[in-house]
Amino acid sequence: MAVYDQSGDRNRTQIDTSRKRKSRSRGDGTTVAERLKRWKEYNETVEEVSTKKRKVPAKGSKKGCMKGKGGPENSRCSFRGVRQRIWGKWVAEIREPNRGSRLWLGTFPTAQEAASAYDEAAKAMYGPLARLNFPRSDASEVTSTSSQSEVCTVETPGCVHVKTEDPDCESKPFSGGVEPMYCLENGAEEMKRGVKADKHWLSEFEHNYWSDILKEKEKQKEQGIVETCQQQQQDSLSVADYGWPNDVDQSHLDSSDMFDVDELLRDLNGDDVFAGLNQDRYPGNSVANGSYRPESQQSGFDPLQSLNYGIPPFQLEGKDGNGFFDDLSYLDLEN
């Protein structure tokens, strides 16, 4: 800080380098953590004494900044009491009950942390009727750690870590030795696990369904093939259709009614059959070397005489001067 004298010349310069920016506080000098603690104690006292049913707080606005203002992801943020700065940081603030003033809750690296800080402040201010961004998150105590603390919470699994503010007005996690676990991250992991389980169950169900369908089609195909083969066997002819089946009893058949085909063919190729027939029909005849010689000729019997049925023999005589038959005397008709 520079000090000037009445002449306007600078005679002394004093620069205070030890001054740091204090945390934001209200006009009465109380910090945000102290104010939240007061609201929490007030709500606990009112719930114990009052018998009237309290009104549910108004929904309020969830639009955040005006359209076109704030950070690039501000328009996609739907958390209550959370908005994004143009440089990417997220801030949270809450309005006190009965249309009170707004309380600055701090700056956070993610929207989820800012939303969790808002929930803690809402629980302290409005009690069990508070409208929360994460209704299923566990309740945590709101305490005051120092004159520079903002929204301070007890570190439990699934809750927001303690936030403090440095001279540059940016919130940093309070060193507690344990990494913070946030409700949204746990919820997101559980949802992912549930989705994976559902996908696994769905894929298994689809696999079993299509396997059963394919098995049914294979059975129908095999059954159709078997029926086709049976139909072809019924339509086709077998040995039983052309001859005697193997299981037919042939004892009642007479052997004289049967003949051997091979023997018949052998007899047809030879001369024995004709010899036997001639001997049976003409006992007086003989067949020798394939030449037929009647037995009547062998004994001097004249076949012409055997054919004489009482008719006088034919005589060739010329009549009426016709000498045609005279020249035929040289023929030996008897021989």
From Swiss-Prot:
Phenotype when changing V91A: Affects the binding to the CRT/DRE cis-element
Compartment list: Nucleus
Tissues expressing the protein: Expressed preferentially in roots and stems, and at a lower level in leaves.
One CC-aspect GO term: nucleus
One of the GO biological process terms: positive regulation of DNA-templated transcription
UniProt short sequence motif Nuclear localization signal, positions renumbered to this chain: 19-55
Result of changing E96D: Affects the binding to the CRT/DRE cis-element
Compositional bias ranges of the Basic residues kind: 52-66
Entry's induction text: By high-salt and drought stresses.
Record-level Gene Ontology MF annotations: DNA-binding transcription factor activity; transcription cis-regulatory region binding
Annotated family: Belongs to the AP2/ERF transcription factor family. ERF subfamily.
Name of this chain's protein: Dehydration-responsive element-binding protein 2A
Organism: Arabidopsis thaliana
